[in-house]
Amino acid sequence: MLKSKFWLIKAPWYVVPYFLLSVFIAGYFYIDPPYKITNNFLSQLGQIYVNEKLNLVSFLLFNIGLFNVGFVISLFYYNLFYFLNVEQINIFFLRALQILGILSGICFAGVGIFPTDITFSYHVFFANYSFYFLLAVSILQTILIFKTNVLSNQYAFGYMMFCVFLALYVRLLLFGGNPAEGMPEGMFQAKHVISQKLIVLTIMIATLHQSIGINYYYKKQLNV
């Protein structure tokens, strides 16, 4: 069950809409003060308490959704190794892609397991490293797609653009300063908050784009 093309083709199309819907509903039920798209991070939806008020509905929706995203990312990259290895290309790069992809998924799941208001240091660790690992993954994946005939180079060019956006976001994480500086308590600078939301959306789109290419390959093989 873990080794299955289901995780490459169908699972992303289940988990991405589910997560996006969870975010919208969690934002609606976010405890007072209202959730602000430009000044509240996504992970604030997953807080257990907001201003000492129980934020149970948003907490459950967001964290379960994000855990599922991390779970699917891990299994996506576990199976991508076998998908790309049909041509016996560089096994070292492939194995590195698999391991780093799984670690990235574990980190995304970790963000959902450790709420920011209860376990802040663990939350920040998993949040940051999910993007660090994913940047390495996106670089390796771009290289490997260029090296193989399994996927068209259009998917490599798409992932190359994703690499650029992700690298800019990682730069912001490392050198963008304190996002809370000069902001009221519980609010953060818009450049950090909006960038986070855009890169998460980009991750979703990039994954679905890859899934389309993989599905096309399998369909083409059936017609050979």
What are these regions (language model features)?
Residues 140-224:
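Terminal transmembrane helical module of multi-pass membrane proteins
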